[in-house]
Amino acid sequence: MIDWDRLMEEAKTAREMTYTPYSHFPVGAALLGASGKIYRGINIENASYPLTICAERVALFSAYSMGERGFLALAIVTNAPTFSSPCGACRQVLVELAPGMPILLANLAGERMLTDSSSLLPFPFTPESLLGQPGNV
């Protein structure tokens, strides 16, 4: 069973560590690995906007760099008045590294919406999309 309250609190805590001097849109993420460990992610902006990275990818890449390969759930918290879903780049990474993973979208008012990575990107580009076979580029 997933403790969504704990994941949401971890994402809120992470959100306080963001570097968002341009958008002023802090995002915190908390990713639950199959090991039971929680990996936090934050968005980090750069004056050269394309170099900015999102909280969701920071959490996933951090977990992957620590050897985690199974993912059970992700909570994403913003200060938006409505829910904010991951950007297209994050959706692509999520659907490849954690297909079908439950994702909780939440704001600071405590409103929540539960979805999953596959629903966020219904027609993904997958390893099989590479000429039909992974590794055949």
What are these regions (language model features)?
Residues 23:
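Active-site segments that bind and position negatively charged phosphate/pyrophosphate groups
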Residues 2-20, 68-137:
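C-terminal binding/interaction regions
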Residues 26, 43, 75:
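Conserved beta-strand segments that form the floor/walls of ligand-binding pockets within enzyme
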Residues 32, 61-67, 96-97:
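Alpha-helix C-terminal capping segments
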Residues 43-57:
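Compact, glycine-rich, soluble single-domain proteins
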Residues 37-38:
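Hydrophobic "anchor" residues
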Residues 26-33:
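Short beta-strand scaffold segments in enzyme catalytic cores
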Residues 10-13, 55-62:
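Short, well-ordered amphipathic alpha-helical segments that serve as non-catalytic structural scaffolds
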